[in-house]
Design a protein with these regions (language model features):
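N-terminal leader segment of winged-helix/HTH proteins
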Residues: 1-39
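Solvent-exposed, non-membrane alpha-helical residues enriched in polar/charged side chains
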Residues: 33, 37, 68, 112, ...
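Short, hydrophobic-biased segments on the C-terminal half of alpha helices
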Residues: 64, 82-83
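Charged, amphipathic alpha-helical coiled-coil/dimerization segments
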Residues: 3-4, 83-142
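C-terminal regulatory/oligomerization modules of transcriptional regulators
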Residues: 1-10, 59, 135-155
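N-terminal helix-turn-helix DNA-binding core of bacterial DNA-binding proteins
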Residues: 30-74
């Protein structure tokens, strides 16, 4: 596309990293959504459940603020999703022992059972989806972390 009227800097759409990332993200999210249907979880619910479990296994005191920071989900959405998970009996939210403004989050036995099953499902899907990267996946992940780090520094 070399027209003087064109606002695009790229000859082909496939030369645009942003457009490619958008396409890949949509494709991946559609697959994740389908994979999680059998667990009756949305992607956000899964990410928060898995993060509570991950942080708990790392011996961290899990708060809503920590979860929001860890997942990059805004605090209001984090609170809304956690409330829905609490209503499903998958987690508990309690007053923090020392900070009365904070809430700690922990999984119930039902939540632990479900997240263990769902993690296997998602990891199987990820393995299949990202298999074309094969040996390059570690380098790919490092580049994604670099993009995340750069974005966080500018905020």
């Amino acid at each position: 596309m070399n027209s003087k009227e064109s606002p695009f800097q790229f000859e082909k759409a496939d030369d645009s990293s942003g457009f490619l990332l958008w396409q890949v993200t949509n494709l991946w999210q559609r697959g994740i959504k389908k994979a999680l249907e059998k667990h009756e979880l949305t992607h956000s619910q899964f990410v928060l459940l898995a993060s509570v479990h991950w942080l708990t296994l790392a011996k961290q005191s899990v708060t809503q603020v920590l979860l929001s920071s860890h997942t990059k989900i805004d605090p209001m959405s984090t609170s809304t999703v956690l409330r829905s998970l609490q209503e499903k009996g998958l987690l508990k939210r309690q007053e923090h022992e020392t900070d009365t403004r904070a809430k700690t989050v922990s999984l119930t036995d039902k939540g632990i059972t479900l997240v263990n099953q769902a993690v296997k499902t998602v990891e199987q899907y990820d393995d299949e989806f990202f298999s074309p990267l094969a040996k390059e996946s570690k380098d790919f992940n490092k580049k994604l972390v670099a993009l995340l780090s750069r974005k966080l520094e500018s905020e």
